[in-house]
A protein has these predicted regions:
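Hydrophobic/aromatic-enriched cytosolic interaction surfaces used to assemble or bind macromolecules
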Residues: 1-297
Length: 297
């Protein structure tokens, strides 16, 4: 055994997953390694560095298409990482829909990527990448689809810039999945403490850099989903109000709104409070929400 192998065992380095092993969380893959997180939207690229200790550090935003940003910033981005490793969140060119009766087989994301028809059946389209979030209490699922051509374009641009992609995700969908998990835990606790009273309907509002996903549920069944990319800005929130209005108007006494938003959370919360003054709002938003999700999971 080489001395280097002994030192790896003593330091537990040999038990750490490789950076390109997507079956592990980002936090485990980059223990004591610097990495960079990027969020791609229509108007530009936001980024946040992660230290070797796993802490979020310097950040920034540059307007313009990804190709131009990488040409300008590739050296700086590389310097913020160990060996050029990055994770990317796409905030455009995706669709989230509500589907019924999809298979609940224990299939990995690799199976969904390689043979989506085995999971989605006739709903599978050529040239798409998919991800799923199932409702454990009903036959409904939230389905994310992204153009495969767009994913390949991102991969090609990063490779040409000397950077490595460890993960590509959709920020809104990741935040939706996190929200649904928290709602499921809260619902279980509510049932344990309240055997007679029924939990009211829930309107989940997910907002990430102007893109939104709104999911309505009644008695733990998902009944309606609306998703829009680059819907609103800080200067023009009216499009968000328009899409929310019919769903908010359907809320009854005892229903509630669950909000999970990025930096624009206070603006969205103010809008919801004005639209539904008598409805309870559970705001689970956190500072740097998308960056925290990307750096840990």
């Amino acid at each position: 055994m080489k001395l280097s192998d002994v030192s790896k065992v003593l330091s537990f380095a040999s038990f750490r997953p490789d950076p390109d092993d997507g079956s592990f969380s980002w936090k485990k893959r980059f223990t004591k390694r610097k990495s960079l997180l990027l969020n791609l939207s229509r108007d530009g690229v936001a980024w946040r560095a992660v230290s070797r200790e796993g802490a979020l550090t310097e950040s920034g935003f540059i307007q313009g298409p990804l190709k131009d940003v990488l040409q300008e910033m590739s050296d700086e981005f590389s310097a913020m990482t160990d060996n050029g490793w990055c994770a990317v969140s796409v905030n455009q060119r995706y669709v989230i829909t509500l589907e019924k009766n999809l298979t609940r087989k224990d299939l990995t994301n690799d199976v969904l990527r390689v043979t989506p028809r085995s999971v989605l059946g006739a709903k599978a389209e050529r040239g798409k990448r998919y991800s799923l979030a199932h409702n454990p209490e009903s036959n409904t699922s939230a389905l994310l689809s992204v153009d495969e051509e767009y994913i390949k374009e991102i991969e090609s641009l990063f490779k040409a810039s000397g950077l490595k992609l460890g993960r590509i995700c959709c920020g809104v969908f990741a935040m939706l999945d996190e929200t649904l998990n928290q709602i499921q835990l809260a619902t279980k606790e509510y049932k344990d403490e309240n055997t007679k009273d029924s939990l009211g309907g829930i309107l989940s509002v997910i907002s990430c850099n102007g893109s939104v996903c709104i999911l309505k549920s009644e008695k733990e069944k998902w009944t309606e989903l609306r998703s829009r990319v680059a819907l609103f800005t800080e200067d023009d929130i009216a499009p968000l109000e328009k899409i929310l209005l019919p769903m908010v108007n359907d809320l009854r006494e005892g229903d509630r709104i669950v909000l999970n938003a990025c930096e624009e959370g206070s603006q969205v919360r103010k809008l919801l409070r004005g639209m539904a003054p008598s409805i309870k709002i559970n705001d689970i938003s956190r500072s740097a929400a998308i960056w925290n999700l990307m750096s840990k999971y």
